[in-house]
Amino acid sequence: MPEVWQAVAQSTGLESLKKTTRDIPDYDELMKYRLAILDEHNITLPIIEAEIAKLKPLDGAVEFLAEAVKHFQIAIISDTFYEFAGPLMEKLGYPMLLCHTLEVKEDKIVGYNIRQPDPKRCSVKAFHDLKYRVFAAGDSFNDVSMLEEADHGFFFSAPQNVSELYPQYPLTRTYDELLAGLLAKL
């Protein structure tokens, strides 16, 4: 999924909104930072939704999912919000999405609700409790606990500072590499 916050930063000219968990690993700290910026600059949910509507899935994502679903059940476990994800999920064919919710009052984002602490690890644990083997891919610090919990974890287009700290996870740069890595673990 493309970075929603990067798109909003670009459209508003607010460089400060470009920060992601690659920059601020603590998601709660990052979201408080973002909400303060939104409030300070009076950026409302409709403004953000307008930018989200322009976003397209990452190049190759639709084709990757179409091929991957032939071999795996797919769940996207994301630190995004349902209020943001709809347009992109439609473009991806509505895969299962596990994410968070926003608190919105009069079109202003005033807060957010994290599904539970460490939701990515907990999601993988829940799939394990259901006796599923879990393969996971992520690109940032906030994905590491999910990769640790999964039967097999991969980095996908992770920045060097992240992948170097966790060399136990193969780094894939393309969807073809990721699919090949996943299929090799079947």
Question: What are these language model-derived features?
Answer:
Residues K105-Y112, S163-P170, G181-K185:
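Short, charged, surface-exposed secondary-structure boundary motifs
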Residues L30-G60:
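Metal-dependent phosphoesterase signature
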Residues L98, Y169-L178:
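Short acidic-hydrophobic, aromatic-tinged amphipathic segments that line or gate anion-handling sites
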